[in-house]
Amino acid sequence: MKRQTEKYSLYSSVGRSLLAALGAVTLMTACGNDSDPAETATADSADSVVPAPATAARTSPSSASADLEARHSEPSGYSVRDSAGIQVIETAGSAWTEETAWTVGPEPLASLGGERTGGTSLHGAGRIVILSSGGFVVAHPQGSQLVWFDPNGRFQHAAGHLGRSPGAFMIVGDILAMPGDSVLAVDPEVRRVSVFGPDGEFARLESIDFREAGSPSAVSVLSDGTILGTREFEFEEGMSAGLNRDSVPLVILQPGGGFTNTRTLFPTSQHWLFEFGEGLAGGPAPFGAESHVAGTVDGFWFGSGDTAEITYHGADGRLQKILRWQGSAEPLPAERFEKFEADAMAAAARNGAALAEMRNFLRDLPSPDTTPYLGGMIVDSDGRLWIRPYHVWTEQAGGWWTVFDANGRRMGMVEIPAGFEIRAIGSDRIYGVWTAEDGVESVRVYALNK
């Protein structure tokens, strides 16, 4: 949990553990509204600000079951028009029928941990990247390693160890796949990038101005070799207790040093701040508006969670497309909110030092009427966009994901196994982390049946 003291933003040791417990999200832009782009701020103007959508724009509540019914019964609607040079896509219903809808295999093709991963448990696994060979690489922060697997999930090799020498990590952060199946791994502690070859051999180090650039999270490698990054919410002068949103640029990092900011500022996810001691503390607002990004080689998708709308921007932040779909926000029953509060207190009680902060965090936390429209986005290896249903950090992953094709047409919904958090999606397989009832995590691979 973040705290503010005087003019400085800092993490206490207690706060770091609680921030992790709060399921801190990567903070992205929120850039959806009901106006056409010609009527709002554009990405061409210097230091322009994309307005945060008003929560009043949410439509009447619905449920995943209603969407599932629509997947099989509503006719597919799809239109594309131009507005001031920006493509506006509107889609409704589903292109899939009950017979053609995609499904996930009932059992995993591979469940990875222990002996099958060279003795590494993979508990706490981070990002997963898919290689052109069909193999994949798993970031394992707890082991200070990257772990390579072949297309069938067989362990190949691991690279990295704890340390500051070349090829070592103090912290394994984001990893990204590069052309030629090299893998780029960020170490935010020592502010550098390590590049490993397809065989897992360490290739080179590159320094990057991470902290000077606002300690961004790496999202994707762009076609020119630069790295798209996103910034976190930061405390600012004048912020007060309650719900807060910041506006920040995205950042383009140049390997070897240097960075540039997008000219457009984007609102971050919503944060809940409360008075704690002589300053403020806080974290992402549970069930509050969340912003997410999904990168491509040419740009990135943004979604705010406030409306059934996402936007696509070029690498310079320039708005290119608006994608709107027919849908409504899921209602938030009082029972669900109360269960979250109870589960959050139970989690904090297991970490006694964080109990007081959690109690203060929850004391006046508002309960919205509905949940965000999305809880995450992933672009698969074929360019399709997958939108994750929202769940707060105490809730089980899985549920019904919505799929759009590369042209923005809504294809339908795919049910993901309970407890499975997707990290990467290939042409015919899904990769992610599954959490057992006892909290033990393992990496799983499921078939994607089309």
Predicted features along the sequence, with ranges:
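Sec-dependent bacterial lipoprotein signal peptides
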Residues: M1-M28
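Eukaryotic scaffold repeat domains enriched in small/polar residues
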Residues: C31-K450
